[in-house]
A protein has these predicted regions:
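A residue-level signal for beta-strand positions that form part of recognition/binding surfaces
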Residues: 16, 41, 269, 329
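Glycine-rich, charged/polar anion/phosphate-binding loops
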Residues: 1, 5-7, 193-194, 256-258, ...
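Single conserved hydrophobic/aromatic residue that forms the stacking wall/gate
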Residues: 2-13, 322-332
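Conserved PLP-enzyme active-site core in the AAT-like
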Residues: 68-298, 307
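Conserved PLP-binding catalytic core of the aspartate aminotransferase-like
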Residues: 305-324, 329-330
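Positively charged, low-complexity intrinsically disordered leader regions
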Residues: 19-24, 28
């Protein structure tokens, strides 16, 4: 609610849908300044829109991040997050326990772009994970709660290993939502969502979100020239210098949304704003219902196995630590 407290007496109660492609400025000089500054994106709705901005601010606050940006889908959020710091000849590491569509993106599409995905078992030892790193490895990727296996990802352990190697940890927090887990608190540097699922909550709207923690030092390792070196599209601006704490999402907005058009529409942003208002209530009920179904299926003689953190064979306390007491939605 803090995001909304700047409203004055007589202001509209709900955020308006700003269905506009462009925005008004008083002079050509002002327009030129905005176009030349990658941190000022309210020039064309392919980059930014006031309704979308409201969603971004709320989700950044919920995740405890420094900045956020929306995309046209969860898959677009994943794609943009990888392409933002990886290029042909690079590699990255991903957990084997992730969404099937993401595996297809990583194993087939990224391979065709010259980017290698190296998979590691989420239960691998630290030494086994370390062995997967190469000189050209740019990031580590995992899902808080895997889709659909519901495996719980040890965010803190993978974050420590990633940081030891000078690269960020990107975590897909779609299934957990910030109500059940805030990956940034456990060391994640970038958090992404398919807002289509629990943020929207009603099966009507496709969208994605990318949240930046603001804590990762993009300059330290020298591995991320996309963020640290002068960008020719913006007269030699370095994103790390121009947007400290938000360089990652600023570059995606300025470069990848410009080039791919993977932009969330204002109407969809408005629907996500409505979904966020009931997120905690809905997730709480999902959890309650899921545990009842788990209990029923566990006792059913014709059910061989139920995938859910509360009945995991793994004695590890990870799911208790990162989630709220095994609370998660159920997928069969």
């Amino acid at each position: 609610r803090d995001v909304e407290r700047s409203r004055g007496l007589g202001d509209v109660y709900k955020r308006q849908i700003v269905q506009s492609t462009t925005y008004v400025y008083d002079s050509s000089r002002e327009i030129a300044e905005v176009f030349d500054d990658p941190t000022k994106s309210l020039i064309y709705s392919r980059f930014e829109n006031p309704t979308t901005d409201a969603v971004e601010k709320k989700i950044a606050a919920l995740e405890g991040g420094a900045a956020a940006m929306c995309t046209s889908s969860g898959q677009a959020a994943t794609l943009c997050s990888i392409l933002n710091i990886c290029q042909a000849g690079d590699s990255f590491i991903a957990s084997t326990s992730i969404y099937g569509g993401t595996i297809n993106l990583f194993s087939i599409t990224m391979k065709r772009l010259g980017i290698e995905c190296i998979y590691v078992d989420p239960d691998a030892t630290d030494d086994e994970i370390q062995a997967a790193f190469k000189d050209n490895t740019k990031l580590v990727f995992g899902e808080t709660i895997a889709n659909p296996a519901l495996t719980v990802f040890d965010i803190e352990r993978f974050a420590n290993i990633a940081h030891k190697n000078g690269v960020p940890l990107i975590v897909d927090n779609t299934f957990a939502t910030p109500y059940l887990c805030r990956p940034i608190e456990w060391g994640a540097d970038i958090v992404i969502h398919s807002a289509t699922k629990f943020i929207g909550g009603h099966g009507t709207t496709i969208g994605g979100v990318i949240v930046e923690s603001g804590k990762f030092d993009w300059k330290k390792s020298g591995k991320f020239p996309q963020l640290t070196e002068p960008n020719p599209s913006y007269h030699g601006v370095s994103f790390a210098d121009a947007a400290p704490g938000a360089a990652f999402v600023t570059r995606i907005r300025a470069i990848l949304l410009r080039d791919t058009g993977a932009t969330l529409s204002p109407i969809h942003a408005f629907i996500f704003l409505q979904g966020l208002e009931t997120l905690s209530l809905r997730v709480e009920r999902h959890v309650e219902n899921a545990l009842k179904v788990v209990d029923f299926l566990n006792k059913h003689p014709k059910v061989e196995k139920v995938n859910h953190p509360s009945v995991s064979d793994d004695p590890s306390p990870v799911s208790y630590t990162h989630l709220r007491a095994h609370e998660t939605s159920l997928h069969l």
